[in-house]
Amino acid sequence: NLYVEGGSEQFRYGFGGSYNKIQGVMKSSIRDIFSGNLDLLYRVGKLTFSNKISVDVTKYTNPVVPFSEYAHANPYYPKRTVDGIVEKWLEYKDNEFSATDASEIVGNPLWNAALSSYDKSKMFGVRNNFNLEYRPFDFLYIRGRFGVAKQTSDSERFTSPEATEFDQVELLKKGSYNDVRRDDFSYDGDLTLTYGQIFNDAHQINAVLGMSISERKSISKGFSAVGFPEGNYTTPGFSNKYPD
Protein backbone atom coordinates (compact mmCIF):
# COMPACT_ATOMS: atom_id res chain seq x y z
CA ASN A 1 0.00 0.00 0.00
CA LEU A 2 1.17 3.52 -0.80
CA TYR A 3 -0.44 6.87 -0.01
CA VAL A 4 1.03 10.33 -0.52
CA GLU A 5 -0.56 13.58 0.61
CA GLY A 6 0.36 17.23 0.73
CA GLY A 7 -0.78 20.77 0.05
CA SER A 8 -1.67 23.74 2.21
CA GLU A 9 -4.41 24.66 4.65
CA GLN A 10 -6.51 25.91 1.74
CA PHE A 11 -5.81 23.09 -0.71
CA ARG A 12 -5.04 19.45 0.13
CA TYR A 13 -4.38 16.50 -2.12
CA GLY A 14 -3.65 12.85 -1.68
CA PHE A 15 -3.20 9.87 -3.95
CA GLY A 16 -2.49 6.27 -3.30
CA GLY A 17 -2.58 2.75 -4.63
CA SER A 18 -2.46 -0.82 -3.47
CA TYR A 19 -1.86 -4.23 -5.00
CA ASN A 20 -2.79 -7.55 -3.52
CA LYS A 21 -2.35 -11.04 -4.92
CA ILE A 22 -4.49 -13.66 -3.24
CA GLN A 23 -3.76 -17.34 -3.67
CA GLY A 24 -6.83 -19.50 -3.20
CA VAL A 25 -7.01 -22.89 -1.55
CA MET A 26 -6.53 -24.60 -4.91
CA LYS A 27 -3.26 -23.98 -6.75
CA SER A 28 -4.86 -22.47 -9.88
CA SER A 29 -7.14 -20.12 -7.94
CA ILE A 30 -5.54 -16.65 -8.10
CA ARG A 31 -6.93 -13.17 -7.61
CA ASP A 32 -5.01 -9.99 -8.52
CA ILE A 33 -6.45 -6.79 -7.05
CA PHE A 34 -5.29 -3.26 -7.81
CA SER A 35 -6.85 -0.14 -6.27
CA GLY A 36 -6.01 3.51 -6.73
CA ASN A 37 -7.53 6.76 -5.51
CA LEU A 38 -7.09 10.51 -5.82
CA ASP A 39 -8.40 12.86 -3.10
CA LEU A 40 -8.77 16.63 -3.47
CA LEU A 41 -9.93 19.18 -0.88
CA TYR A 42 -10.30 22.91 -1.46
CA ARG A 43 -11.43 25.55 1.02
CA VAL A 44 -12.26 29.15 0.17
CA GLY A 45 -14.00 31.31 2.72
CA LYS A 46 -17.10 29.51 3.96
CA LEU A 47 -17.11 27.08 1.04
CA THR A 48 -15.48 23.65 0.99
CA PHE A 49 -15.14 21.34 -2.02
CA SER A 50 -13.90 17.77 -1.93
CA ASN A 51 -13.61 15.15 -4.64
CA LYS A 52 -12.53 11.51 -4.52
CA ILE A 53 -11.84 9.29 -7.53
CA SER A 54 -11.40 5.55 -6.97
CA VAL A 55 -10.30 2.95 -9.51
CA ASP A 56 -10.42 -0.81 -8.95
CA VAL A 57 -9.09 -3.53 -11.24
CA THR A 58 -9.52 -7.20 -10.37
CA LYS A 59 -8.45 -10.27 -12.33
CA TYR A 60 -9.56 -13.77 -11.41
CA THR A 61 -8.15 -17.10 -12.48
CA ASN A 62 -10.37 -19.96 -11.37
CA PRO A 63 -9.63 -23.71 -11.33
CA VAL A 64 -10.94 -25.45 -14.44
CA VAL A 65 -11.36 -28.62 -12.40
CA PRO A 66 -13.56 -28.18 -9.31
CA PHE A 67 -12.53 -29.62 -5.98
CA SER A 68 -15.44 -32.07 -6.17
CA GLU A 69 -13.75 -33.92 -9.05
CA TYR A 70 -10.60 -34.41 -7.00
CA ALA A 71 -12.72 -35.62 -4.10
CA HIS A 72 -14.49 -38.08 -6.41
CA ALA A 73 -11.14 -39.53 -7.48
CA ASN A 74 -10.61 -41.91 -4.57
CA PRO A 75 -7.05 -42.17 -3.22
CA TYR A 76 -6.62 -45.79 -4.34
CA TYR A 77 -6.87 -44.73 -8.00
CA PRO A 78 -3.36 -44.31 -9.49
CA LYS A 79 -3.31 -40.80 -10.97
CA ARG A 80 -0.18 -41.51 -13.06
CA THR A 81 1.36 -44.56 -14.66
CA VAL A 82 4.65 -46.00 -13.44
CA ASP A 83 6.30 -43.86 -16.14
CA GLY A 84 4.72 -40.69 -14.73
CA ILE A 85 2.20 -40.33 -17.56
CA VAL A 86 -1.18 -38.80 -16.74
CA GLU A 87 -3.87 -40.94 -18.31
CA LYS A 88 -7.35 -39.77 -19.23
CA TRP A 89 -9.25 -42.33 -17.15
CA LEU A 90 -8.69 -43.71 -13.68
CA GLU A 91 -8.67 -47.39 -12.89
CA TYR A 92 -11.78 -49.13 -11.66
CA LYS A 93 -11.75 -50.86 -8.34
CA ASP A 94 -12.11 -54.15 -10.22
CA ASN A 95 -9.39 -53.04 -12.71
CA GLU A 96 -11.75 -53.59 -15.64
CA PHE A 97 -12.43 -50.82 -18.13
CA SER A 98 -15.78 -50.94 -19.87
CA ALA A 99 -16.60 -47.95 -22.04
CA THR A 100 -20.08 -49.37 -22.55
CA ASP A 101 -21.09 -48.35 -19.05
CA ALA A 102 -20.41 -44.60 -18.97
CA SER A 103 -21.83 -44.28 -15.47
CA GLU A 104 -18.83 -46.18 -14.11
CA ILE A 105 -16.19 -44.11 -15.87
CA VAL A 106 -14.21 -41.81 -13.60
CA GLY A 107 -12.16 -39.11 -15.31
CA ASN A 108 -8.69 -38.22 -14.15
CA PRO A 109 -8.79 -34.64 -12.78
CA LEU A 110 -5.06 -34.26 -13.45
CA TRP A 111 -5.74 -34.94 -17.13
CA ASN A 112 -8.44 -32.28 -17.28
CA ALA A 113 -6.28 -29.77 -15.40
CA ALA A 114 -3.40 -30.19 -17.89
CA LEU A 115 -5.50 -29.30 -20.95
CA SER A 116 -5.87 -25.89 -22.60
CA SER A 117 -9.07 -25.16 -20.66
CA TYR A 118 -9.36 -21.92 -18.73
CA ASP A 119 -11.77 -20.04 -16.50
CA LYS A 120 -10.91 -16.38 -16.03
CA SER A 121 -12.60 -13.06 -15.46
CA LYS A 122 -11.71 -9.41 -15.04
CA MET A 123 -13.44 -6.40 -13.55
CA PHE A 124 -12.82 -2.68 -13.93
CA GLY A 125 -14.60 -0.10 -11.81
CA VAL A 126 -14.32 3.65 -11.36
CA ARG A 127 -16.25 5.89 -8.99
CA ASN A 128 -16.22 9.64 -8.47
CA ASN A 129 -17.67 11.31 -5.37
CA PHE A 130 -18.05 15.08 -5.16
CA ASN A 131 -19.00 16.91 -1.95
CA LEU A 132 -19.83 20.55 -1.32
CA GLU A 133 -20.31 22.26 2.05
CA TYR A 134 -21.32 25.89 2.43
CA ARG A 135 -22.18 27.88 5.55
CA PRO A 136 -23.14 31.41 4.43
CA PHE A 137 -24.49 32.22 7.92
CA ASP A 138 -24.08 30.66 11.34
CA PHE A 139 -27.69 29.52 11.24
CA LEU A 140 -27.67 28.06 7.71
CA TYR A 141 -25.73 25.05 6.46
CA ILE A 142 -25.86 23.71 2.91
CA ARG A 143 -24.46 20.34 1.91
CA GLY A 144 -24.47 18.69 -1.51
CA ARG A 145 -23.14 15.35 -2.68
CA PHE A 146 -23.03 13.63 -6.06
CA GLY A 147 -21.50 10.29 -6.99
CA VAL A 148 -21.22 8.42 -10.25
CA ALA A 149 -19.92 4.88 -10.77
CA LYS A 150 -19.12 2.69 -13.75
CA GLN A 151 -18.19 -0.99 -13.63
CA THR A 152 -17.53 -3.54 -16.36
CA SER A 153 -16.86 -7.25 -16.00
CA ASP A 154 -16.00 -10.01 -18.44
CA SER A 155 -15.99 -13.73 -17.64
CA GLU A 156 -14.62 -16.33 -20.06
CA ARG A 157 -14.65 -20.09 -19.70
CA PHE A 158 -13.27 -22.55 -22.22
CA THR A 159 -13.40 -26.33 -21.82
CA SER A 160 -11.14 -28.36 -24.08
CA PRO A 161 -12.75 -30.94 -26.39
CA GLU A 162 -10.29 -33.44 -24.91
CA ALA A 163 -11.86 -33.10 -21.45
CA THR A 164 -13.43 -36.23 -20.05
CA GLU A 165 -16.89 -34.65 -19.90
CA PHE A 166 -17.07 -34.72 -23.72
CA ASP A 167 -16.22 -38.41 -24.07
CA GLN A 168 -19.81 -39.36 -24.95
CA VAL A 169 -20.46 -36.21 -27.05
CA GLU A 170 -20.44 -36.22 -30.85
CA LEU A 171 -17.29 -34.89 -32.48
CA LEU A 172 -18.69 -31.57 -33.78
CA LYS A 173 -19.97 -30.65 -30.32
CA LYS A 174 -16.87 -31.40 -28.28
CA GLY A 175 -15.45 -28.41 -26.42
CA SER A 176 -17.30 -25.32 -25.23
CA TYR A 177 -16.76 -21.59 -24.85
CA ASN A 178 -18.81 -19.13 -22.79
CA ASP A 179 -18.36 -15.38 -22.46
CA VAL A 180 -20.53 -13.17 -20.25
CA ARG A 181 -20.06 -9.41 -20.15
CA ARG A 182 -21.81 -6.95 -17.88
CA ASP A 183 -21.90 -3.16 -17.69
CA ASP A 184 -23.19 -1.37 -14.60
CA PHE A 185 -23.74 2.36 -14.32
CA SER A 186 -25.17 4.31 -11.41
CA TYR A 187 -25.36 7.77 -9.96
CA ASP A 188 -26.79 9.22 -6.79
CA GLY A 189 -26.81 12.60 -5.16
CA ASP A 190 -28.48 14.66 -2.48
CA LEU A 191 -28.81 18.27 -1.39
CA THR A 192 -29.58 19.27 2.21
CA LEU A 193 -30.33 22.67 3.74
CA THR A 194 -30.23 22.88 7.53
CA TYR A 195 -31.54 25.88 9.42
CA GLY A 196 -31.16 26.36 13.17
CA GLN A 197 -31.48 29.51 15.23
CA ILE A 198 -32.24 30.59 18.80
CA PHE A 199 -34.38 33.66 19.49
CA ASN A 200 -34.28 35.64 22.72
CA ASP A 201 -32.18 32.90 24.33
CA ALA A 202 -35.36 30.93 24.83
CA HIS A 203 -36.84 29.82 21.53
CA GLN A 204 -35.16 27.50 19.07
CA ILE A 205 -36.19 26.78 15.50
CA ASN A 206 -34.74 23.89 13.49
CA ALA A 207 -35.64 22.96 9.94
CA VAL A 208 -34.18 20.55 7.41
CA LEU A 209 -34.98 20.51 3.71
CA GLY A 210 -33.53 17.90 1.41
CA MET A 211 -33.80 16.18 -1.93
CA SER A 212 -32.08 13.22 -3.55
CA ILE A 213 -31.70 11.57 -6.95
CA SER A 214 -30.44 8.16 -8.02
CA GLU A 215 -30.46 5.79 -10.97
CA ARG A 216 -28.96 2.39 -11.76
CA LYS A 217 -28.57 0.60 -15.08
CA SER A 218 -27.21 -2.86 -15.88
CA ILE A 219 -26.66 -4.52 -19.25
CA SER A 220 -25.56 -8.14 -19.63
CA LYS A 221 -24.50 -9.91 -22.82
CA GLY A 222 -23.58 -13.54 -23.28
CA PHE A 223 -22.07 -15.65 -26.03
CA SER A 224 -21.58 -19.41 -26.30
CA ALA A 225 -20.03 -21.74 -28.86
CA VAL A 226 -19.32 -25.47 -29.14
CA GLY A 227 -17.29 -27.76 -31.36
CA PHE A 228 -13.55 -27.10 -31.16
CA PRO A 229 -10.56 -28.94 -32.64
CA GLU A 230 -8.09 -30.59 -30.32
CA GLY A 231 -5.03 -28.59 -29.35
CA ASN A 232 -4.52 -24.98 -28.35
CA TYR A 233 -7.48 -23.60 -30.33
CA THR A 234 -9.28 -21.85 -27.52
CA THR A 235 -10.95 -18.80 -29.10
CA PRO A 236 -14.52 -18.79 -30.46
CA GLY A 237 -13.23 -18.26 -34.01
CA PHE A 238 -12.30 -21.97 -34.07
CA SER A 239 -15.75 -23.15 -32.95
CA ASN A 240 -18.11 -25.13 -35.13
CA LYS A 241 -21.52 -23.78 -34.09
CA TYR A 242 -23.71 -22.21 -31.47
CA PRO A 243 -25.05 -24.63 -28.86
CA ASP A 244 -28.45 -26.17 -29.57
Regions found by a protein language model. Give the residues of each.
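Surface-exposed loop/interface segments of Gram-negative outer-membrane beta-barrel transport/assembly proteins
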Residues: 1, 24-29, 35-125, 143-244
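Periplasmic plug
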Residues: 14-16, 50
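A common structural microfeature
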Residues: 12, 127, 139-143
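Long hydrophobic segments that form regular secondary structure
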Residues: 133-138
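Transmembrane beta-strand segments that form the barrel wall of outer-membrane beta-barrel proteins
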Residues: 17-23
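A generic beta-sheet turn/junction motif
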Residues: 6-10, 19, 42-46
